[in-house]
Amino acid sequence: MAFRQSEHEMSVTSLDSSVELRSRSPSPQVFNPRKLRFADDDFDKDTPEGASPQHPLQQRPKLSSGEEQQLDSKIGKEGGDGDVSMSPPCQKVRALRLFSTPATPKTILQKSTTQCSNHLSAAAAAVNASRRSDDLFRLSERPRSLPLHNRKLPTQDTANVNPFTPDSLMAHNKKRCRTQFGRENLNLNVNAMQKYLLSDACDDDVTEEAGDSMREIHQQAPKRLALHDTNISRFKREFMQVNVIGVGEFGVVFQCVNRLDGCIYAIKKSKKPVAGSSFEKRALNEVWAHAVLGKHDNVVRYYSAWAEDDHMLIQNEFCDGGSLHARIQDHCLGEAELKIVLMHVIEGLRYIHSNDLVHMDLKPENIFSTMNPNAHKLVEVQPQQTKDDDGMDSVYEELRHSENLVTYKIGDLGHVTSVKEPYVEEGDCRYLPKEILHEDYSNLFKADIFSLGITLFEAAGGGPLPKNGPEWHNLRDGKVPILPSLSRDFNELIAQMMHPYPDKRPTSQSIFSHPILSAVDSKSKLQLGLELTVEKRKNEILMNKLREAKKQIKLLEQRVNLLAVTNNPDSLDGQRCLRSFTRRMRTPFSSHGKFDSISDRNKNVITNI
């Protein structure tokens, strides 16, 4: 018993000495360590005024078992629900506990979190020391744990950035030092993060400023949205599937009818889920290219795209004429029809090249045709009075029964890339030039010209094309066979487009202005008749507008004259006199075809002249 008392006295003595050492040491301006002041607030309340309160380690109030349980529950509430209490469970052990007492791993982890919160609170106090002294004392006495990984950053609306838009291409063209860009972003991120973390101890203005800085970070460094984040259900809800148009390597194309507008569309759906796979970038690349290039008459029109069940779906224009590949399976095309194909495709290709983009997969399977839906309507509304004068009765009759009026369009833009920052994925080797297979991307425009030239060669009867072997090399070494069904000029043009050196191939603009594609030679009689009908219809509409404009001008003149008369009553009398005088002057002589009784100077009456 004596040994226990001496041990207790030694522990109390050590505690007293530690308290004295802390009291003698000069108080620094930094935050003091956390003190074990358990139930100290209740003890201070019970101390009468004027009496000096004793330290809780020297004299502690005697508590009953019920009060002890209430005290422990109060301490547990201050520590937080579910957190391990920093205080020992027993009052005697609590009095003997020092800061260097070993603790469990959970308490060590909680201490580290507390120290981190103390550090953040100190930084916040350094910024706002003049205005928030009370909050600093509260933070130093009872620091609050602040888990950084649970901090919720402000949610932002995000969207993809299309790399094929003119703004994106201009942004890529601006050269900028990587180190400078990294430093600016680093400074912006650090400053914004500091402001945001200290927002609890700062004013609302600082919080708003930090939030704005974080928004600037999100806007300046956009991320590509994954397909998982954009999954929506539209296919079965908005469209009714009619049949399958075609099946490719990566997707299936359906002919669908929109339930709302009743129009027919072609919806391309990927065969396999592309979200998170290696084909995700290619699917997004096709959507971006369609969104930028789908505004030309010779490019398949784009309407919308979405991700559904991790599959990519693209809503495009429905081309009722099918592909050029299906068209040349039955018969080879003649020179007249090949000129039409070349004229339409080169117009679409020239539009793509004008946007600093290249197709990189031009072939008969990716060239589609559509019938002109307005050809028969324009013939029906043609005025009857003009048919007798223009001598085009046979043309109109041929237009009524014609089904050969087609427009060729370029589709399947999955391999489209920019010439300034090319990301080339090789397409069909049967239509690619040698330099692309050798990874020479210095002249990508001419690669599309080669693909178009060999496509015309196949459509004219030069197919099927080989995938390898001597014949494959001969076609790329300038040894192009002469096709007997084509003229000499057309054979020479195809040979120039398939020249082994890219620099010697013609551009899309030079092909468009080639003499072989003149306005008269490249258009058939049916197309000329259709264009004539369209122009006459336009003239008729303009004439109707001119008549309406003349009527409006006449009404305005009458209103102006009426206003002038009402404002000037004197002018009204003058106008009346003038009208009466002019009316008298206009009155003819009263004669009925003969002069009746006209007298002369000699007073002789002349009758019956």
From Swiss-Prot:
<dbReference type="GO" id="GO:0051299">
    <property type="term" value="P:centrosome separation"/>
</dbReference>
<keyword id="KW-0597">Phosphoprotein</keyword>
<feature type="region of interest" description="Disordered">
    <location>
        <begin position="147"/>
        <end position="166"/>
    </location>
</feature>
<dbReference type="GO" id="GO:0005737">
    <property type="term" value="C:cytoplasm"/>
</dbReference>
<dbReference type="GO" id="GO:0004715">
    <property type="term" value="F:non-membrane spanning protein tyrosine kinase activity"/>
</dbReference>
<dbReference type="GO" id="GO:0004713">
    <property type="term" value="F:protein tyrosine kinase activity"/>
</dbReference>
<keyword id="KW-0498">Mitosis</keyword>
<dbReference type="InterPro" id="IPR000719">
    <property type="entry name" value="Prot_kinase_dom"/>
</dbReference>
<keyword id="KW-0131">Cell cycle</keyword>
<keyword id="KW-0132">Cell division</keyword>
<dbReference type="InterPro" id="IPR017441">
    <property type="entry name" value="Protein_kinase_ATP_BS"/>
</dbReference>
<keyword id="KW-0829">Tyrosine-protein kinase</keyword>
<dbReference type="GO" id="GO:0051642">
    <property type="term" value="P:centrosome localization"/>
</dbReference>
<feature type="binding site">
    <location>
        <position position="412"/>
    </location>
    <ligand>
        <name>Mg(2+)</name>
    </ligand>
</feature>
<dbReference type="GO" id="GO:0004861">
    <property type="term" value="F:cyclin-dependent protein serine/threonine kinase inhibitor activity"/>
</dbReference>
<feature type="region of interest" description="Disordered">
    <location>
        <begin position="1"/>
        <end position="88"/>
    </location>
</feature>
<dbReference type="GO" id="GO:0051301">
    <property type="term" value="P:cell division"/>
</dbReference>
<dbReference type="GO" id="GO:0000287">
    <property type="term" value="F:magnesium ion binding"/>
</dbReference>
<feature type="modified residue" description="Phosphoserine">
    <location>
        <position position="25"/>
    </location>
</feature>
<dbReference type="GO" id="GO:0001700">
    <property type="term" value="P:embryonic development via the syncytial blastoderm"/>
</dbReference>
<feature type="modified residue" description="Phosphothreonine">
    <location>
        <position position="165"/>
    </location>
</feature>
<feature type="modified residue" description="Phosphoserine">
    <location>
        <position position="52"/>
    </location>
</feature>
<comment type="similarity">
    <text>Belongs to the protein kinase superfamily. Ser/Thr protein kinase family. WEE1 subfamily.</text>
</comment>
<keyword id="KW-0808">Transferase</keyword>
<dbReference type="GO" id="GO:0010972">
    <property type="term" value="P:negative regulation of G2/M transition of mitotic cell cycle"/>
</dbReference>
<keyword id="KW-0479">Metal-binding</keyword>
<feature type="compositionally biased region" description="Basic and acidic residues">
    <location>
        <begin position="37"/>
        <end position="48"/>
    </location>
</feature>
<feature type="modified residue" description="Phosphoserine">
    <location>
        <position position="168"/>
    </location>
</feature>
<feature type="modified residue" description="Phosphothreonine">
    <location>
        <position position="47"/>
    </location>
</feature>
<feature type="binding site">
    <location>
        <position position="268"/>
    </location>
    <ligand>
        <name>ATP</name>
    </ligand>
</feature>
<dbReference type="GO" id="GO:0005524">
    <property type="term" value="F:ATP binding"/>
</dbReference>
<dbReference type="InterPro" id="IPR017164">
    <property type="entry name" value="Wee1-like_protein_kinase"/>
</dbReference>
<dbReference type="GO" id="GO:0000278">
    <property type="term" value="P:mitotic cell cycle"/>
</dbReference>
<feature type="modified residue" description="Phosphoserine">
    <location>
        <position position="27"/>
    </location>
</feature>
<dbReference type="InterPro" id="IPR011009">
    <property type="entry name" value="Kinase-like_dom_sf"/>
</dbReference>
<feature type="compositionally biased region" description="Polar residues">
    <location>
        <begin position="153"/>
        <end position="165"/>
    </location>
</feature>
<feature type="domain" description="Protein kinase">
    <location>
        <begin position="239"/>
        <end position="517"/>
    </location>
</feature>
<comment type="function">
    <text>Acts as a negative regulator of entry into mitosis (G2 to M transition). This kinase specifically phosphorylates and inactivates cyclin B1-complexed CDC2.</text>
</comment>
<protein>
    <recommendedName>
        <fullName>Wee1-like protein kinase</fullName>
        <ecNumber>2.7.10.2</ecNumber>
    </recommendedName>
</protein>
<keyword id="KW-0067">ATP-binding</keyword>
<keyword id="KW-0539">Nucleus</keyword>
<dbReference type="Pfam" id="PF00069">
    <property type="entry name" value="Pkinase"/>
</dbReference>
